[in-house]
From Swiss-Prot:
Alphabetical list of Gene3D superfamilies matching this protein: Leucine Aminopeptidase, subunit E, domain 1 (3.40.220.10), Zn peptidases (3.40.630.10)
Protein name: Probable cytosol aminopeptidase
GO BP term, pick one: proteolysis
UniProt superkingdom: Bacteria
Chief location of this protein within or outside the cell: cytoplasm
Gene that specifies this protein: pepA
Family to which the UniProt record says this protein belongs: Belongs to the peptidase M17 family.
Claim: Hydrolase is one of the keywords in the record: yes
Keywords: Aminopeptidase, Cytoplasm, Hydrolase, Manganese, Metal-binding, Protease
Binding site for Mn(2+) 2: 265, 270, 288, 349
Length: 497
């Protein structure tokens, strides 16, 4: 897919040559000046007339009309050099690859060094490029009858750079791994729930474990009953599909200590139970396992890159259905931790299955906990659809998660958990906890509830209800599942201190 070369010449035969262009007042230089000379000054003229733009994420195409071996020049606007960030560069590459895909180009050459600044070196640019390629060109395969005519797509990208070839190849590999794993998560989330049950999710995890030599454990219903996972089992009561508690373990150190626990909500479809969702809210509830997908995507990256860390991934997988056996408002259930819970809302089921998953992650030695869940509609009201809500009991761990999210462009914002919030989730008159104390501060109530099970273990909760799916196409992908938090979790593990 990617080939690294050093000597760039306009006489080289390519369908497309891609060049980065910054906004600046000085005369054209480097490869852009060479393009201008070959085309008899046309680049300068088109820049002056606005047909070529160096503004952020503007893509301009110029045909060379046989004045060079390269057929077409694509200029990628990058804005002011001092304002270019890794995230903006990744988006610019994403827009480029979408443009090339729409134009049905099958190969391209990229002058990588034209995308480099004093803050973004060639390795960063190579990572951004390869990651953006996979993210931007992703398509969910779907289930329509296939057309006989194969669709044209980019099959070859040649990267020209004067940087160390081995280092660039390594950066391209890492970016590709990040992009592919995010797409794996997207596909899981986009898959209809009749084709992705808890058993299917468990089978996927086992395949991942076998590929990357993870230790794994799949708890069946009988196992959960013996362990006292009453919160998880309550949610599954109404379903004909048995629950699965999925555990993957990666050991990158000699001893099993300082273990990072990744916990992902795996509700494969959520009707709301007897606290039934309205029709409009039930559509797309196949995506209620996006937290599980994020954790599995992160484990794919971990399996490929083999960081020197210890990681345990725990995923409670079930659907939340209605039947004569389903759990009900006013039920009292006992979690694996021994804490009792009064159910006031069967549509607040995610926190119930996560409660037992968090306890089980601690049972497997998790020293730090990060849970990821499409937990509440309240977080969408609070933060919208571009920012993930976060809550924590540990400043140092949160800062590491925050740094990882900033690096990957998956932005988070911290919400508080006060003593008053804790009192509200402990407000039941007949049980230790209340799973839904009220609508006020609903996102915080979900986090505060989970904090009761994290207890003193350093913990960060990530509510991705607003960010796991997008209704609009964007520079780094189509509408549908985003694969949010795959890259943040993997980056956190890689950089963890």
């Amino acid at each position: 897919m990617f080939t690294i070369k050093q000597q760039l010449s306009l006489d080289t035969t390519h369908e497309v040559l891609v060049v980065g262009m910054f906004e600046k007042n000085q005369p054209l230089d480097g490869i852009i000046a060479e393009c201008d000379r070959r085309l008899g000054g046309q680049v300068s003229v088109l820049l002056k007339e606005g047909d070529i733009s160096a503004k952020k994420k503007q893509i301009s195409k110029v045909h060379t009309l046989n004045q060079a071996g390269v057929k077409r020049l694509y200029f990628v606007g990058l804005g002011k050099e001092e304002e270019l960030t890794f995230d903006l560069l990744r988006e610019a590459f994403g827009k480029l690859f979408k443009t090339l895909k729409q134009a049905k180009r099958t190969e391209a050459a990229i002058a990588l060094d034209t995308f480099v600044t004093k803050d973004i070196d060639a390795n960063d640019a190579a990572h951004a490029l390869s990651e953006a390629y996979y993210l931007a060109t992703y398509e969910f395969p779907g289930y329509k009858q296939k057309k006989n005519e194969p669709e044209k797509r980019i099959e070859s990208i040649t990267i020209y750079t004067e940087a160390d070839q081995a280092e660039i190849e390594a950066s391209v590999f890492v970016g590709s791994v990040y992009g592919k794993a995010t797409n794996s998560a997207r596909t899981l989330v986009n898959t209809p729930s009749n084709l992705l049950t808890a058993a299917d999710l468990a089978n996927y995890a086992v395949e991942l474990a076998n590929k990357y030599e993870f230790e794994y454990e799949i708890l069946e219903k009988d196992d959960m009953e013996k362990l006292g996972m009453g919160a998880f089992l309550a949610v599954n009561q109404g379903s004909k599909n048995p629950p699965k508690m999925i555990v993957l373990k990666y050991q990158g150190k000699e001893t099993w200590e300082n273990v990072i626990g990744l916990v992902g909500k795996g509700v494969t479809f959520d009707t709301g139970g007897y606290s039934l969702k309205p029709r409009e809210s039930m559509v797309d509830m196949k995506t209620d396992m996006a937290g599980a997908a994020a954790v599995l995507g992160a484990m794919e990256i971990i399996g490929e890159l083999r960081p020197e860390q210890n990681v345990v991934a725990v995923i409670p997988a079930t659907d939340n259905m209605i039947s004569g056996e389903a759990f009900k408002p006013d039920d009292v259930i006992t979690s694996m931790s021994g804490k009792t819970i009064e159910v006031k809302n069967t549509d607040a089921e995610g926190r119930l299955i996560l409660a037992d998953a968090i306890t089980y992650a601690k049972h497997h030695g998790a020293s730090y906990l990060i849970d990821v869940a499409t937990l509440t509609g309240g977080v969408i009201v609070a933060l919208g659809v571009h920012t993930t809500g976060a809550m924590t009991n540990n400043e140092a761990l949160f800062e590491q998660v925050l740094e990882a999210s900033a690096e990957t462009g998956e932005f988070i914002w911290r919400l508080p958990i006060t003593e008053k919030d804790k009192e509200r989730v402990r407000s039941s008159k007949i049980a230790d906890l209340n799973n839904s104390p009220g609508r006020e501060g609903h996102a915080i109530m979900g986090g505060a509830f989970l904090g009761e099970f994290a207890e003193d273990t350093p913990w960060v909760h990530l509510d991705i209800a607003g960010t796991s799916v997008t209704s609009k196409e964007h520079d780094l992908g189509p509408s549908g599942a985003t694969g949010v938090m795959v890259r943040t979790l993997a980056t956190l593990v890689e950089r963890f201190e």
